[in-house]
């Protein structure tokens, strides 16, 4: 079976250095991939590159489309939903329901269809009580959940999640994890919280020096409950 997403020898340069250096990656349908790395190593750049928001060399293929121009990437962004680190970058409509309906409207649904879909989704996610709220007045945790609802409303095949649980309190964290765990679609998740990644993902890679290293998140329960990371192959292996 062909992967949903495939990157082949993709490079992104910034200030004279390669942030991504002839990097290759594939993501299968339903697969949940943890993307791990130090601050500033290029994890966000990689997510942005997948959806055409960073100029890059190499080959990006998604959903059977070999992406060569902005028109191609617009088609990709309808199927690969990107959740930004900062929900304020994603939410710009007056009310929650307007923010959630924005994507479906852009995909061609009528106003009535978009509102019905968005209200139903908010209800299913346990967020129906927020529908009429002014987005600007929400708490940080509520904004993050609403931004997730907004990308899910586009009914994507892949979620690209950039620090989705960062700075959430316990209540909103558990709600976020419950929502993500219930999704049956592929994901790439960037997070510094290995405990969260172990719960949500089934494969891990580490971004270092512009390359991806295959890795494994696990715990040795007989010694420690703390999740830790193992590199499992040599650098340069096909991913």
Curated annotation (Swiss-Prot):
ATP binds at residues 37-44. InterPro entries: AAA+_ATPase, ABC_transporter-like_ATP-bd, ABC_transporter-like_CS, ABC_transpr_CbiO/EcfA_su, ECF_ABC_transporter_ATP-bd, P-loop_NTPase. Coiled coil: none annotated. GO terms for cellular component: ATP-binding cassette (ABC) transporter complex. Its main location: membrane. Gene3D superfamilies: P-loop containing nucleotide triphosphate hydrolases. Its EC number is 7.-.-.-. It is found in: Cell inner membrane. Keywords: ATP-binding, Cell inner membrane, Cell membrane, Membrane, Nucleotide-binding, Translocase, Transport. SUPFAM superfamilies: P-loop containing nucleoside triphosphate hydrolases. GO terms for molecular function: ATP binding; ATP hydrolysis activity; ATPase-coupled transmembrane transporter activity. It is a peripheral membrane protein. Residues 5-234 form the ABC transporter domain. Probably part of an ABC transporter complex. Responsible for energy coupling to the transport system. Belongs to the ABC transporter superfamily. This is Putative ABC transporter ATP-binding protein BAB1_1388.
